[in-house]
Design a protein with these regions (language model features):
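Alpha-helical transmembrane segments in inner-membrane proteins
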Residues: 1-337
């Protein structure tokens, strides 16, 4: 029996929630010392072996929560931007928003290492300013192109390249220790992160998700032309701006906490849309998919390989082939991007 669109989305969300809980339990159970389910439950409530309690509550739990909120933020941000711009490639990392957040964050790191006054600016604040600055530049440069999705995408790619060059230059102005730390962060890493890193992203997700859900009905209408949505009493331009502001904020906060973890925002929305079998991208489902991707990649990066890899390395290995697939779609006659 074929489910109605919203029922299909609800079923996909339920499956994703169950999968997320299973992955989170596994992530908190594996490490230098494996933990069985009974030990894990006792440790979460602060009882049992002290070493296990410390490993679970002070080391694994903060990292798992950070992976979840960073992945969810990237997933929701990517789903929103792809839906608003009607382009499966229009994710914050491709458009240059993540690059803007990165150059601002690395700039703060570099100036802070030199003892400059800007170095006291918190990295999440710098990342937000950088992300919104990049978005404003994309909008300004894309104004003459009529804000069409494909034109904005090309502008974003060009801007991202320029911002990446600036970031690389900033690395050359830092000392060896600072440059190594920043370079590790730029690959997308959750190593040595804790509750302080997760809190700004968690707040951002808690604020943005209700806004996105409130705009959900209007957002689904964006797959139609503005002339048609006006007849339904929906201001398409205002809804797009509000949603893109939410997308930029989430992408910038996620970047500040985990670095520019590549391809999560790009992949999550498309996986969510296919899983739900609907025309639009369900943002909540995209967030769940993003959380699962980052958590699985982070767990594998610290347990499967002899050395602990940055999570961005694994997401890039998976995401790059998917990007090539999206680029090949027009040649197969499935519609231009």
């Amino acid at each position: 029996m074929r489910l109605k669109p919203r029922a299909s989305v609800a079923r996909a969300i339920a499956i994703a929630v169950v999968a997320l809980l299973v992955v989170a339990a596994v992530a908190m159970s594996v490490g230098d010392r494996a933990t069985n389910p009974a030990e894990l439950l006792r440790a979460l409530f602060g009882s049992g072996d002290e070493n296990v309690v410390y490993a679970v509550r002070e080391v694994r739990l903060p990292r798992v929560v950070l992976a979840l909120v960073v992945g969810a933020a990237f997933g929701i941000a990517g789903g929103i931007s792809q839906g608003v711009l009607r382009n499966p490639l229009a994710s914050p990392d491709v458009l240059g928003v993540s690059a803007g957040a990165s150059v601002a964050a690395v700039g703060v790191m570099a100036i802070g290492a030199l003892g400059g006054p800007i170095g006291v600016v918190p990295i999440p604040v710098a990342a937000l300013l950088g992300g919104f600055g990049a978005a404003a530049l994309i909008a300004a440069l894309g104004f003459g192109a009529g804000f069409r999705g494909r034109s904005l995408l090309l502008v974003g790619i060009a801007l991202s390249t320029a911002l990446t060059g600036i970031t690389q230059y900033l690395l050359t102005r830092m000392d060896v220790s600072g440059a190594q730390s920043a370079a590790s962060w730029l690959t997308g890493s959750l190593n040595a992160r804790g509750w302080d890193d997760a809190l700004p992203v968690l707040i951002g997700v808690a604020v943005v998700v209700p806004i996105v859900l409130i705009l959900g009905h209007s957002a689904r209408a964006l797959i139609f032309e503005d002339d048609l949505t006006k007849n339904w009493g929906i201001n398409g331009s205002a809804v797009r701006v509000a949603l893109l502001v939410c997308s930029v904020a989430l992408a910038a906060l996620a970047t500040s906490a985990g670095g520019p973890i590549g391809f999560v925002a790009l992949v999550s929305g498309q996986v969510a849309r296919r899983a739900a079998r609907v025309a639009d991208i369900p943002p909540l489902l995209a967030g769940l998919v993003g959380a699962i991707i980052v958590l699985v990649a982070d767990t594998a990066s610290r347990t499967v390989f002899p050395v602990q890899l940055p999570v961005g390395v694994l997401t890039a290995i998976v995401g790059a082939p998917y990007l090539l697939y999206l680029l090949q779609r027009p040649r197969r006659g499935r519609g231009a991007l």
